Amino acid sequence: MHPREQTIFALSSGRPPSAIAVVRASGSQAGTALRKLAGAIPAARTAKRVLLRDSVGEAIDDAVILWFPAPASATGEDIAEFHVHGSRAVVNALIAALSSIDDARAAEPGEFTRRAFENGKIDLTEAEGLDDLIHADTDRQRRQALRQLQGLLGDRARGWRKELIDASALIEAGIDFADEEDVPEDLARPALEKIAQLRREIEQTLAASARGERLRDGLTVAIAGPPNAGKSTLLNRLARREAAIVSPHAGTTRDIIEVYLDLDGYPVTLIDTAGIRETDDPVEQEGVRRARDRVAKADLVLWLSDDHGGEPDQTIRSGETSLWLIRNKIDLAGPENDGAKPGRFETKAGQSAPPWRFRISASRGDGVDDLVSALTAFAEKLLGSSEAGVITRLRHRNILRDAVASLAKAETLAGRGDELVAEELRIAIHLMGRLLGRVDIDDILDSLFKEFCIGK
């Protein structure tokens, strides 16, 4: 039997031990599994308490079972669910009993979702939304992923595809029945009006695409500066834990340290880098090289210095990354800090602005709240709200850009031959099929479903 035709099973809940464990089976032998382990198939969608037994009659557990017959199930196949006590021993015994059933095997990662897709229960954009939901770290990411899973982009793409098919039908009718007297003379005009409208709608969706993609991926903020400027101390203060080793000796941090922050629902990866300076130490040189590399790729650089100086060099200043200069250690005595208030620096009338944007004490926390508020506002400006993201992946953007190009070409070809316009519409319709996962997507499926956990 082909693997796609076999019944699959897996633990679908969290890893044991737990209060309850859910083991799910999907496929033609799901009903057989219920009969062999529980004695009978219960009424559809009705929970039933039973004593599960293995093939030799040994009791496995006092469990609750459910039956979801095809096609009205999550995968479109027969599904059996076993809700058992969540010990490793119980789960292992149940998995072993299911393994003894003919044509049943353990599921691969994402295989339940793949079968749901292949049986038309979800489209590819919804499967991608489920993947994003599983991997969501913040509430804004969760809301965006849930909207995708519920068909936000898929419904829109299906609507566009239908409109394109309608426009194509008008063009094709004009070609096929050009000599018929009862066919209107200019069927292309309403078709071209529809094409122009669709192109504008897709362009508007693309215009907001960057925010959806960036919210999914999150922002990267690098803490950089000279050695012993307090970078690791600031990282620990923002992370609210001891993520990096702090030492009074310069050059303690040699490698990149990353921590994750949730700033009001915005995902931020915070990076602590090695102190940037000239050095003869080959290990420290590698740390400085890596620091410069991550600084160049970050969305924002927090450059820390103290009253001993340490301004960023021209390479860092001239980069495309946003740069905030921060004066740290204001709790220490020094002419630069006399009378200085922590937080964002406000320039008074007639006063020249200093090179730094914030004054803080990372060790005491002075001014850090203002810095966090500014970071949150920065993230909000770049990422927007979760409701803005219709396009959340580069795949979506590339396909829709190609569709816009085909529609624009169809408009320019108007008057040169309806056959040329019809061909561009066929390309655009095909692209909508790719977006929904109905054509030319085997390589995409293999990559996507491998990201899912086993049992999903």
Curated annotation (Swiss-Prot):
Domain of life where this protein originates: Bacteria
GO CC field: cytoplasm
Claim: Transmembrane helix is one of the keywords in the record: no
Keyword presence, Cytoplasm: yes
One family name in Pfam for this protein: TrmE_N
Domain TrmE-type G: 218-380
Free-text comment on the cofactor: Binds 1 potassium ion per subunit.
EC number of the protein: 3.6.-.-
The family this protein is said to belong to: Belongs to the TRAFAC class TrmE-Era-EngA-EngB-Septin-like GTPase superfamily. TrmE GTPase family.
Name used for this protein in its record: tRNA modification GTPase MnmE
Originating species: Nitrobacter winogradskyi (strain ATCC 25391 / DSM 10237 / CIP 104748 / NCIMB 11846 / Nb-255)
Source taxonomy: Bacteria, Pseudomonadati, Pseudomonadota, Alphaproteobacteria, Hyphomicrobiales
